Structure formats: structure tokens, C-alpha cells
Curated annotation (Swiss-Prot):
Stretch forming the signal peptide: 1-17
Phenotype of the disrupted gene, per the record: Leads to a significant decrease but not complete loss of fumiquinazoline C production and accumulates fumiquinazoline A.
Assigned keywords, A-Z: Cell wall, FAD, Flavoprotein, Glycoprotein, Oxidoreductase, Secreted, Signal
Species per Swiss-Prot/TrEMBL record: Aspergillus fumigatus (strain ATCC MYA-4609 / CBS 101355 / FGSC A1100 / Af293)
Entry's induction text: Expression is positively regulated by brlA, a conidiation-specific transcription factor involved in the early stage of asexual development and necessary for conidiophore formation. Expression is also induced by the cell wall integrity (CWI) signaling pathway that includes the mitogen-activated protein kinase mpkA and the transcription factor rlmA. Expression is negatively regulated by the transcription factor sebA.
Disulfide bonds, paired cysteine numbers: none
One cellular-component annotation, GO: extracellular region
Glycosylation positions in this chain: 99, 261, 288
Pathway in which the depicted protein is active: Alkaloid biosynthesis
Protein name per the record: FAD-linked oxidoreductase fmqD
Domain FAD-binding PCMH-type: 68-243
């Protein structure tokens, strides 16, 4: 697999039991009734698709991963905010008697254990809400939940602007914001939530409200890091900025012989205390089952001038890469394949850890075991994506202005992206990955578990996603805005402590 250094981005404390891998089902509603139920309350532009329709797969977005994925009796594609509100109002008034579960889908990239418990649901797919309203006078842009990064990247670049986005062009824009949002501008603009000005939200009661620093301020704090727990966002407004370095970046990819892996790890460790704000990316450790050899790569994107990037490029080139590419590219286009994050329908499992430092010896221990395990198990495909991020901009925001997203001091966002042929291999893959996550956490982690909620598997616990100190406030808001726990299936806020 190719490495993508910026994710839509954890010790997982217990092994995955068989029960966690098995889904439970709700009482099934007849899909043929869905059109009769929702047809009268939706606008003509909205669509309803049933799995029995011959064109269902052509019209309904496939999820990125098949791991513990939800199942649906129907997909409703609202065309307006009014449609979303009507669906929610129906659930409030009658869904309990029909035992209907609803599941909102923005980009479908989330991978969570508990999604497997969402069965026979109605999928609210938001892809038709793909509007963009650019307001240059006020330096903001408002978008719908169906917008993908590529649409916003290209529009902003055409007018000399930027905002903090995740890295992949194919990924939904609003979805990652709700969990914080890491991307190539993190060291300069901070996480996505720092650029969020306001949002329109359909709540569990079916009301449509605005959340911002001046309206529903407490809820605005909560949706900036725990947003999936409080409703369906129907639009979001972001602050925009003049492009960094005139919109040009230095994109570099390096490949190394496996024998020099320790030198690569040592270099990453040397960056524990110094890292430029404009640089993002990191190492990818993988295994090629065709050549039966491991792969060591270092990919980076430097949002700045060639002169500022060169000292850092020199450090990497001094290791003697066997292949390299260094180019100037427009920031919004990128310069590398976006597989795997743009390839849907594979059996991906994603584990995440946020770390405070790098320890080369720990990485070496993992690499040696990983190569041995991969060589003996041709079904096992895993990328360790080890991303270094500058914390300057994120930590500069005053505490009173921050959202709930807690781990601004994390220097490393580490992801184990596992691909297996099918679910029968999940537990064996899990048994290999977990001990190394324990080791990473013990040696390179914080005193408490830090997990980036967008990339969390879902069994780590709310303290690891949202911060122990934030839970009392979050629980109170959950009780106020979603007392029946309709939202947040993947990384839920509890209704009590």
C-alpha cells in the first residue's frame, strides 16, 4: 500500500473478543415501507434507495472499510437541511414504535467496532448536500456535509486562499472536523476545529440550531472534537486565509533499503525536540509480499520555500535513499497516490496512538517482529504510518478558545493500518498488533492513553478520545442534547460517569 501522511487521523487496552467482532441486529422494518413513510416528508430532490434495487450500489456510497460495517434496510439521501430535519422529526415521533435506527453518513471513512452493532438501520447519506458558498469579503467559506476536500481545495486555491483541511482529496471535509481534523497545515493553522466559525446542527429532538462562539457556545465547544455525539451537521463555516508560500509546497518521497532502517529511526528520534511548523508527513513501514521484502519510506510535504525545506531534506538524503523524488507542487494537488484512503470496500482495520516522543530502539523492535510475522503470514498486510506533526499553532490557541479535542501536545500520530482478506483473520491480526501498541504506549506515549478519535478503533474509552478532564462537561451536554443516545455510535460519550 502507498502511504498517505495526513489522515482524516492509542493504545487499545484489551484484545478484541469474539463478541466485539460480531454484530447484533435490531428488529427489521420492511424496506418496502420506507418510501411510504418518508416520501411525504421529503423534498422532490431527495432520494430513497432500497438494497433490493438493481442500481442500489451505483447510487449509494460504499463505505471505505468492510470491517464491522453497519447494514441498512434503506438509504435516504436528503437534498436539503429541511429533509434532514424531517427525517429526525419522524424518528422522534414514531421511530421508537417501529424500532428504527438511523445512521448518518458523510464520507463513510470511519472504522469503528461499534458500527457493527448498527444493523438494519436507515442510512442518511449526506452526499447531495455538496454546496459551497465562498465569502471573500468576510474571509469565510460555508459548505455542506457532502463536500469532499478536492472541491474545497481547488476552489480556495483558485482565489489564492487556504484553510486547515485533512490531506486526502477524496475524504469528506466536515466529518474529520468533528473529531479535530489533522492535516498538512496543522503546524501553521492548527487542527481543522480552530478554523471552524460556526455550524448548523440538526439535534436529537429534530430542532435545527446554529452553534458558534456566540450561539450555543457550550455545544460549539463540544462539537469541536466530539461532534459526532450531538447531531447531524448540515453546514459548516470555516475561516479562510491567504495561501502559505503563494500556494506552493515542496513534496518529497524517499525509499530506503531495509538494512538502513535503524538510521531512519534514529533520524526521526533526533526530531523529538525540533520540527518546523510547515513540515508534515513521516515514515511508512510496510511489507511487499510479491518481493518478500519490507519497505521503508519517508514522505513529507513542506509548506514553505525550497530554502527553508532544504536543511530537512538534506538530513533525509544523507541516509542514502535508494529512490527519491523532490518536487514543487501546488499545495492543493499533492504529489503522490492517495491509495489506500481513496480505495473503498477493502477490509481495513485502523488502530491509533498519539505519542509524545520517538524511541528508535522501540521502532527497531517492532520492525524486526513485523518483518518476521509478515514473511510467515501472506494474508497480513499492514502499514505503520508514523506521522510527525509540529505542535506550534495548536498549542498557541488559548485554552478558553479551544474545542474539546484534547491532544494538542501530541508530536506523533501513529496508525497501524491493517488489511486482511476477510474477517476470519481479524483476531490473528489483532493479536500481533496489540502488544506493540502496548509497547509504543509504555515507551513513547503519555502518562494516560491519547487516541485521535477520528482514527480510534472504538474500544479505547472516552477518556482516551476526549480527555478525562472534559468528561463531566461532555456528559452534562450529552444529557441535555441527546438524552436517548441517538448519536455517536462509534466513540460514544456516556450518559453518566
Amino acid at each position: 500500500m502507498q502511504y498517505i501522511p495526513f489522515l482524516i487521523s492509542g493504545l487499545v487496552p484489551v484484545a478484541l473478543s469474539k463478541s466485539l467482532f460480531e454484530a447484533t441486529s435490531n428488529t427489521r422494518i420492511d424496506g418496502n415501507d420506507i418510501a411510504a413513510i418518508f416520501g411525504p416528508v421529503l423534498t422532490p430532490e431527495a432520494h430513497i434507495f432500497l438494497p433490493s434495487d438493481g442500481d442500489y450500489d451505483d447510487n449509494v456510497m460504499a463505505r471505505w472499510s468492510t470491517f464491522n460495517d453497519p447494514s441498512y434496510v434503506a438509504t435516504v439521501k436528503p437534498a436539503t437541511e429541511t429533509d434532514v430535519q424531517a427525517i429526525r422529526e419522524y424518528q422522534v415521533s414514531t421511530a421508537a414504535s417501529h424500532n428504527i435506527t438511523f445512521f448518518a453518513t458523510g464520507g463513510g471513512h470511519g472504522v469503528k467496532l461499534n458500527f457493527g452493532n448498527v444493523q438494519n438501520a436507515i442510512n442518511i447519506e449526506l452526499s447531495l448536500l455538496d454546496f459551497i458558498d465562498l465569502d471573500l469579503d468576510n474571509e469565510v467559506v460555508t459548505i455542506g456535509p457532502g463536500v469532499e476536500n478536492a472541491q474545497l481545495y481547488d476552489l480556495l486555491s483558485s482565489v489564492g486562499k487556504e484553510t486547515a483541511l485533512t490531506g486526502e482529496r477524496c475524504v469528506n471535509t466536515i466529518g474529520p472536523t468533528l473529531g479535530g481534523g489533522l492535516g498538512p497545515l496543522y503546524g501553521i493553522r492548527g487542527p481543522q476545529v480552530d478554523s471552524l466559525v460556526s455550524a448548523r446542527l440538526v439535534t436529537a429532538s429534530g430542532d435545527v440550531i446554529t452553534v458558534s462562539r456566540s450561539e450555543n457556545r457550550d455545544l460549539f465547544w463540544a462539537i469541536r472534537g466530539a461532534g459526532a455525539n450531538f447531531g447531524i451537521v448540515t453546514s459548516a463555516t470555516y475561516r479562510i486565509y491567504d495561501q502559505t508560500n503563494g500556494g506552493m509546497a515542496v513534496s518529497a518521497q524517499f525509499a530506503f533499503a531495509p538494512a538502513v532502517n535503524r538510521s531512519v529511526f534514529d533520524l526521526m528520534e533526533s526530531m523529538n525536540d525540533e520540527y518546523p511548523p510547515g513540515m508534515s508527513g513521516g515514515m511508512i513501514l510496510s511489507y511487499n509480499h510479491t518481493t518478500n521484502e519490507p519497505s521503508v519510506q519517508w514522505n513529507l510535504l513542506f509548506m514553505g520555500s525550497n530554502e527553508d525545506a532544504q536543511p530537512w531534506l538534506d538530513k533525509i538524503q544523507a541516509l542514502g535513499p535508494i529512490d527519491s523524488s523532490i518536487r514543487n507542487v501546488p499545495w492543493h494537488r499533492r504529489d503522490e497516490p492517495e491509495v489506500p484512503y481513496c480505495e473503498r470496500g477493502q477490509h481495513y482495520i485502523l488502530y491509533n496512538l498519539n505519542l509524545r516522543r520517538t524511541d528508535a530502539a522501540t521502532l527497531q523492535s517492532y520492525f524486526d517482529s513485523f518483518v518476521d510475522f509478515s514473511s510467515k503470514n501472506p494474508w497480513f498486510d499492514c502499514d505503520l504510518m508514523y506521522e510527525r506533526q509540529a505542535t506550534d499553532a495548536a498549542l498557541a490557541v488559548p485554552l478558553s478558545e479551544r474545542g474539546v479535542g484534547p491532544w494538542r501536545d501530541s508530536k506523533i500520530n501513529a496508525n497501524f493500518l491493517v488489511v486482511t482478506p476477510s474477517e476470519e483473520y481479524d483476531e490473528a491480526a489483532d493479536a500481533f498488533v496489540r502488544p506493540f501498541m502496548d509497547r509504543f504506549q509504555a515507551v513513547m506515549g503519555f502518562d494516560t492513553l491519547h487516541v485521535y478519535v477520528n482514527e480510534a478503533l472504538g474500544d479505547e474509552g472516552p477518556a482516551s478520545w476526549y480527555g478525562e478532564e472534559n468528561l463531566p462537561r461532555l456528559v452534562a451536554l450529552k444529557q441535555q442534547w441527546d438524552p436517548e443516545n441517538k448519536f455517536g455510535a462509534g466513540a460514544p460519550i456516556p450518559l453518566s460517569l
